[in-house]
């Protein structure tokens, strides 16, 4: 019995040493195999210029090998040279075609049978080795039909759970500075709030569920980070070797067999019993049970799998990253802090009584988050789609079946054509604009970090309320600063075209004198 199986219930996250050693082995294996095996990468037969960092006469595999280390530079280079047309990027596992945002209107409403967003996400996130399911839209339907319409009545539950979470996760720091690792704190706060809505009160405060959902998140992104630089034809060799990938399988089985699977069976039995006193739980898990359309969607293991993946990928990690980015920005640009605090205290004099309308009214906070995301987007590319049948665009550009397309959302957000003085961080840039367009969740042809069109991130509305609730309390109740060794804003970590905050930075926090929790 291996170590991971023996410690199933602990749902361990592989250590940096394990993954560091594995990365060295993987690198050596890749270089060896790349030279001895003809590389069957997916090349796209599209008549557009290819953009590389190196001399075009050098071997192509060099550009593919170094893409993950140079992606941002190459993407910006391509955008500067070809922003009104399409260009090709050479990734380790194949070509990707970056389209101009002038094509947005003709592409955004095309059906999945023409442009498939789920398949593109599956490819981009190495789905076969990160356990992503792409065979159903159940979770999207539940979000659109049950979760988003219910946000108003769910806010009190979120606030209640976060009140408990702050008491548990934040240290005692009245009259003294205490060191915390903000990303880890925010990760657990988001996980707690999400769990209250997704799995209900019986699970949301159990350490087993919190550990499972958080560590599953970490292992997904560790696996993606390690496999993205590797050509896909090597994934079957390298993938099973990764400790993070093996941990994902172990964690998933644990959630299916020990946590959510039995809960689903129990709920169905209670409902079938005809007990007049039984009330179905009002949570995401139950909504998935109710809306499942066939035996496969309704299988307890598949429901557990889909819910765990959704909370990990779409709620926990992304929200924690946004809050961490925002905190780093406010520490280094403190002039925006007091106006934000003033708005929050005026809108929510009693945070525990926060409502849907009070959170929506935080226009400065919305604008700040939008500007922080513009400078620190989740990735330089978005609007990922896989072409499912040959497509000819309005200007005659032909996209053959199988082409992976995207748009350069990062460079678009830094283009003077769309943003005045784009290199200046203006936290309240969007406050005086159109009310809908100024919201953090708003998407457009010039703001695509949540995607665009019918397949834009459906969970962004719920996630935004959670992160605004967390950040509004944190800003008002705490002072914060970097330690003496941290000069300036911590540099983001660039993982190919993806951007994440430095998650290993520590921050000093202290309870503010006269803050609501101490008054």
Curated annotation (Swiss-Prot):
The chain crosses the membrane at residues 21-41. Its cofactor is heme. Induction: The onset of expression occurs at 60-hour-old stationary cultures and the steady-state levels correlates with the onset of aflatrem biosynthesis at 108 hours. One of its GO terms (cellular component) is membrane. InterPro entries: Cyt_P450, Cyt_P450_E_grp-IV, Cyt_P450_sf. Pathway: Secondary metabolite biosynthesis. It is an enzyme of class 1 (oxidoreductase). One of its GO terms (molecular function) is iron ion binding. Keywords: Heme, Iron, Membrane, Metal-binding, Monooxygenase, Oxidoreductase, Transmembrane, Transmembrane helix. Heme binds at residue 457. Its EC number is 1.-.-.-. Belongs to the cytochrome P450 family. Cytochrome P450 monooxygenase; part of the ATM2 gene cluster that mediates the biosynthesis of aflatrem, a tremorgenic mycotoxin with acute neurotoxic effects. Synthesis of geranylgeranyl diphosphate (GGPP) by AtmG (a GGPP synthase) precedes condensation of GGPP with indole 3-glycerol phosphate, followed by epoxidation and cyclization by AtmM (a FAD-dependent monooxygenase) and AtmC (a prenyltransferase) to produce paspaline. AtmB is also essential for paspaline production, but its exact role has not been identified yet. This is Cytochrome P450 monooxygenase AtmP. It comes from Aspergillus flavus. The lineage of its organism: Eukaryota, Fungi, Dikarya, Ascomycota, Pezizomycotina.
């Amino acid at each position: 019995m291996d170590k991971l199986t023996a410690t199933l219930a602990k749902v361990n996250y592989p250590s940096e040493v394990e993954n560091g050693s594995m990365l060295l082995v993987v690198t050596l294996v890749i270089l060896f195999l790349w030279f001895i095996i003809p590389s069957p990468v997916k090349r796209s037969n599209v008549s557009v210029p290819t953009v590389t960092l190196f001399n075009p006469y050098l071997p192509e595999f060099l550009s593919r090998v170094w893409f993950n280390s140079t992606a941002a530079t190459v993407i910006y280079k391509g955008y500067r040279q070809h922003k009104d047309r399409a260009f090709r990027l050479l990734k380790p596992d194949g070509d990707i075609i970056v389209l101009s945002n002038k094509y947005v209107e003709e592409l955004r409403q095309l059906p999945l049978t023409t442009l498939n967003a789920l398949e593109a996400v599956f490819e981009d996130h190495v789905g076969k080795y990160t356990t992503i399911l792409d065979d159903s839209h159940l979770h999207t339907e539940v979000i659109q039909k049950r979760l988003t319409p219910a946000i108003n009545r769910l806010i009190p539950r979120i606030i209640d759970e976060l009140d408990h979470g702050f008491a548990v996760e934040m240290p005692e720091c009245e009259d003294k500075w205490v060191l915390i690792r903000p990303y880890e704190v925010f990760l657990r706060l988001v996980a707690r709030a999400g769990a209250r809505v997704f799995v209900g009160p019986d699970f949301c405060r159990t350490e087993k569920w919190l550990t499972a959902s958080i560590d599953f998140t970490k292992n997904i992104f560790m696996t993606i980070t390690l496999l993205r630089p590797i050509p896909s034809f090597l994934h079957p060799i390298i993938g099973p070797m990764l400790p993070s990938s093996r941990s994902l399988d172990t964690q998933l089985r644990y959630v299916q067999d020990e946590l959510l699977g039995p809960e689903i069976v129990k709920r169905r039995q209670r409902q079938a019993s005809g007990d007049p006193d039984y009330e179905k739980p009002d949570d995401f898990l139950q909504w998935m049970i109710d809306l499942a359309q066939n035996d496969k969607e309704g299988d307890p293991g598949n429901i557990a799998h889909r819910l765990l993946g959704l909370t990990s990928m779409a709620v926990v990690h992304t929200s924690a990253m946004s809050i961490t980015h925002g905190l780093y920005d406010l520490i280094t640009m403190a002039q925006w802090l007091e106006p934000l605090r003033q708005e929050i205290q005026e809108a929510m004099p009693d945070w525990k009584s926060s409502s849907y309308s009070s959170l929506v009214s935080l226009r400065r906070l919305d604008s700040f988050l939008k500007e922080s995301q513009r400078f620190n987007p989740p990735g330089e590319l978005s609007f990922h789609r896989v072409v499912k049948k040959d497509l000819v665009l309005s200007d005659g550009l032909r996209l053959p079946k199988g082409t992976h397309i995207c748009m350069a959302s990062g460079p678009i957000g830094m283009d003077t054509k769309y943003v005045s003085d784009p290199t200046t961080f203006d936290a309240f840039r969007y406050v005086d604009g159109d009310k809908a367009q100024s919201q953090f969740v708003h998407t457009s042809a010039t703001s695509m970090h949540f995607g665009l069109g019918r397949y834009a991130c459906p969970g962004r509305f719920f996630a935004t309320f959670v992160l605004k609730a967390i950040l509004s309390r944190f800003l008002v109740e705490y002072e914060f600063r970097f330690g003496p060794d941290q000069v300036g804003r911590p540099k983001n970590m660039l993982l190919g075209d993806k951007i994440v905050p430095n998650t290993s930075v520590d921050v000093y926090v202290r309870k503010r004198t006269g803050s609501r929790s101490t008054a």
